[in-house]
Amino acid sequence: MNRLNNIILLVVFICTHAHSQQAYFVDGYHGGIYGHYPVKWKTQFIVDQLSKHPDWRICLEIEPETWDTVQIQTPGAYRQLKNVVGTKQVEFTNPTYAQPYCYNISGESIIRQFQYGIAKINKHFPGVTFTTYSVEEPCFTSCLPQILKLFGFKYAVLKCPNTCWGGYTNAYGGELVNWVGPDGTPILTVPRYACEKLEENSTWQTTAWCNEESYLNACRDAGIEHPVGMCFQDAGWKNGPWLGSGKNTKSNSVYVT
């Protein structure tokens, strides 16, 4: 009987642990008027998709000057977006003016990128706050923790699962790390996990790009209880929720910003 009880307890523990590992996913769009942002339809498409999929959450990494053109060419969609960006469905995660890679420019230039970009976004969307720095392409450099903190950011993400061809951070650590700048400033950060490998036969994509079960299992084996994947879609793509929505969301993932 004691042996049976032990087996039952073990099964309950395993089932509870498996159930407790909720998978998360960060979706969104990146691009802009000088890159890829089809002004005639994109803003209305975003608003409509958010309304159609209330469980969807997106991060916006759009060149701030884009909103000048959107306001003029599609004023109705622009007004609708203004009403949405203040909700929990949307977060601006990279307000830099031109989405620089950062590692190839000076600290002073990086500061101006944030200063000008934040001012432009606040002009169009007053009251928007900037909490988490997250990017689709590898827009990272060592001095960012200090700069981000000075602009009010609380968190950062060091993943770029779908654009590693531009560079990528080392796979390191588990669920969270403190990213420390050369001046000693730390910022709480989601890293590219040590278990987050490059996709097989790929130098431009990691396993975190679509929350496959193999990736989530690797996270579970590494002790990561709240694994997160991400993909900021090109703004030129006419695609809504990356993993599907509602009951059809891949791997039962929950969208977060």
Each model region followed by its residue ranges:
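Hydrophobic h-region of N-terminal signal peptides that target proteins for export
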Residues: 11-19
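Catalytic-domain carbohydrate-binding cleft regions of carbohydrate-active enzymes
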Residues: 21-257
